[in-house]
A protein has these predicted regions:
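N-terminal export/membrane-targeting signals
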Residues: 1-5
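Mid-length scaffold segments of soluble, non-membrane domains
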Residues: 61-116
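Primarily secretory-pathway and cell-envelope proteins
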Residues: 6-56, 108-178
Length: 178
């Protein structure tokens, strides 16, 4: 199974005021890489950690709110040690305490619509059977609290980095454009 090509960002827009649409992109050697997500805010909630957190340890998070977070790449990538062919994917994070794993999933659609990030019971829509793979992220404590989720891409030459910043956490993973 391969990823569906050319997801349309306008199909992912919800007009949500609580978790506004956000995007990060980088161009490497003429190839576009972008991530589209909905950015929730902390709003005096405990986001990560123990059982009282919105995203407790040991859960899978959709890396945002509303629709599942989407990665588009015009080039083959190696994210840390994970080979990612050009195409479109959904991104999740396995929150295992102080060590997160980035999940790259091949499922983009639920029937005729883009996949929502969670089910009605609050569990994730990530399906392990359709995962391309998982790779470790480098964790650090944020220098100061980050109120609204921020995902960013940066690159120098063919090497780049994806950075996730939210609440008191930063998580990053390197990538190489093939």
């Amino acid at each position: 199974m391969t990823a569906i090509a050319q997801v349309k960002k306008e199909d992912l827009k919800t007009g949500s005021k609580k978790s506004p649409e956000a995007e990060t992109s980088v161009t490497v050697n003429g190839k576009n890489i972008w991530i589209f997500y909905h950015a929730p805010s902390v709003n005096n909630r405990k986001i990560f950690g123990g059982k009282d957190a919105l995203q407790p340890d040991g859960t899978v998070w959709r890396l945002g709110a509303d629709y599942a977070t989407v990665l588009h790449t015009d080039a083959d990538l190696t994210i840390n040690d994970l080979k990612v062919p050009k195409g479109d994917y959904t991104l999740y994070a396995d929150l295992d305490g102080g060590q997160w794993k980035l999940i790259v999933n091949k499922t983009l659609m639920d029937g005729a619509r883009h996949i929502w990030g969670i089910k009605m019971d609050g569990s994730t829509t990530n399906n392990p059977a359709t995962e391309l793979g998982r790779t470790s992220m480098t964790m650090a404590k944020a220098g100061s609290p980050v109120e609204t989720l921020k995902i960013s891409l940066s690159a120098t030459g063919a090497k780049g980095k994806m950075l996730v910043e939210f609440e008191k956490v930063t998580a990053s993973v390197p990538f190489t454009v093939q």
